[in-house]
Every structure is written in structure tokens, then in C-alpha cells.
Amino acid sequence: MKEGKNYAFIDSQNLNLGIKKLGWKLDYKKFRVYLQEKYKISKAYMFLGYLPDNQSMYSSLQGAGYILVFKPIIISREDGKIKGNVDAELVLQAMIDFKKYDKAIIVSSDGDFRCLVEYLYNKNKLEKVMSPDVNNCSVLLKKSAKEKIVFMDNLQDKLGYKRKSTA
């Protein structure tokens, strides 16, 4: 792996919800360092729905070294849930930058990324697919990533947010 020519493309909602299902909270600063040290990631794109109330979180993520790519959110009329589906933006950015990186890491469990993962794999551009949770990862994604899939289930000690004790 060449130093500094690998990019990460992170489906933030999928990552956040996947880790939450495992019962822990990801320390995004540690995660960015981990991506740099383990996979030589020079650019880490994080795709997320934009909510004005989350400005301090966005600033914190940018301070940790993420490049944020926003999508306007939609509020469902039926249940009031907020939707910020970023799949198309992630795929588009991965293709825009295709000639700029040596290898890509896709962080998601979403089977909608199967075609991107398959394409990157066939072009020898896929470093890894990082899925937050082995039990909630799409079978399509697992099949297309083949031996290049890793799961974050066992990374809690390394990447979990730890509260500072006030004692």
C-alpha cells in the first residue's frame, strides 16, 4: 500500500446505527487515526444528511480530519423520521476521485453499494469494505467484497468512545 493515496468513503448513518446496535459509541477521532494508521487513508469522506442543529458535531468531525459531504434531509410525512440517504453521493464521489486514489475503503453494511464494491474489486481498487456489524451486513455486500470485508464488531476497545472519569 502506498502512503497517502488511499481514500475512505463512509456512509455515516449506516456506521452510526450499526455501531449503536452493537451497544457502543464510536470515537470518530480515534476512527480517523485508525484509518490513517492501518489503511494509509489520506482522505476520509463522510456522507451525511444536513441538520442545522448539528453544526458543532460537523465542526468536530472536520477537526478530526473528515471531509463532510452533505445531502439535504427529508422528513417523512408518515412517521416524522428524518431521511438523508447518501448512497448516490458516495458512489458518485468514489467515481469522481477514481483516478486520484490507489485503493478505496467503503464503510457501510448497505447492499446498495454492491455494484460499486464489485467494480472497485474488479479494477483492483478495493482495499476493504468495513461493515459495522457482521449480523446486519448485506449478503450482497459480503459476496461482492469477498475476502476484502472486515467487521467492526471487535474494535470496541480500540475505537469505542470512553467517558472521562470525573473522580
Description of each model-found segment:
Residues 1-167:
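Terminal and domain-boundary accessory regions
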